[in-house]
């Protein structure tokens, strides 16, 4: 959330910065201006009324010594003035509540280093790791490989849960567990503390990281009141862990990695990635989260990006890093890198991680701070990134590591987690006859 005082003091500056995101961001900010002006008017009026109250109290004390007959009339005037103060305070409270509601709908202004653009086509590739493998055959997409190997099952999953769900069988299920353990081991060796968070959280927690109130249609929630929400990413509970806390400066940065299932309604995704496991209602991910000093968050952002890329480098998976343009950034982010893994069966790079610096946007909502050099509390900066998406790593392994005979070579770092298994070959599982 934006700082109301800063917005009110220089509305035009925020308007210019948000205009880089597009007209929608400017429109979200527009209603704030007249309300901020009304807030100033009410604050001036309240200050005036409280001064009049203080003067009236002083006058009553003086009258009590010099003109007792006039005291009762003065007290009646003071009571009337008190009623006016209460009315002004109530009006101010309503305005401030509405301002808070409106500011919850305004996205984070982009960092100056973010390129301008309308959509993903304007993102800037900043580096590439590895080379595209040359195949002596036409590589297959992961959904064909998974079906031929018998390890990815969609028909039975649809019977259980509908579309955008997958059952992993045999070696694919083992591969998923291996990937999770490998990712966690790599990240903890690089200074992250492992967290296993709750998967159901409150509305306040969802609001803290920016999913609410704007993106409720993308979430799954319970029907009880108040509802609980299934997390769309471990970023939500882990970032909120330190809500309303103050850190000493020497404790920063705070670094966490967390494995969790993620649940997303995928509203607005009809017709996109309907085959395979690229876009699911339920998937697994290892998330990286940092709380940083404001002056160190840019450097921590680059380190987090490298940490996310490290697991792909160790697996030997060809990928590239793109800096997202202003029109393709997430709501809470000031700057985001996407890591895109090469999928030869699809002939495309596909996002496998987003690594974002939210600066103080989330921290203002959850009130997480640290003591600066003068000892005064200052808002922390929050950072998050996938380290990385597990299902999409399976996609990349199936497609990049496929062989002409239809088998898939398991990257060496994962083999110890799979009992030494070196490749995935076709498996047969019991199956009844549909009646």
Curated annotation (Swiss-Prot):
This is Serine--tRNA ligase. Catalyzes the attachment of serine to tRNA(Ser). Is also able to aminoacylate tRNA(Sec) with serine, to form the misacylated tRNA L-seryl-tRNA(Sec), which will be further converted into selenocysteinyl-tRNA(Sec). Belongs to the class-II aminoacyl-tRNA synthetase family. Type-1 seryl-tRNA synthetase subfamily. Its EC number is 6.1.1.11. L-serine binds at residues 233-235, 287, 386. The gene is serS. Coiled coil: none annotated. Keywords: Aminoacyl-tRNA synthetase, ATP-binding, Cytoplasm, Ligase, Nucleotide-binding, Protein biosynthesis. Pathway: Aminoacyl-tRNA biosynthesis; selenocysteinyl-tRNA(Sec) biosynthesis; L-seryl-tRNA(Sec) from L-serine and tRNA(Sec): step 1/1. GO terms for cellular component: cytoplasm. Consists of two distinct domains, a catalytic core and a N-terminal extension that is involved in tRNA binding. Homodimer. The tRNA molecule binds across the dimer. It is found in: Cytoplasm. Its main location: cytoplasm.
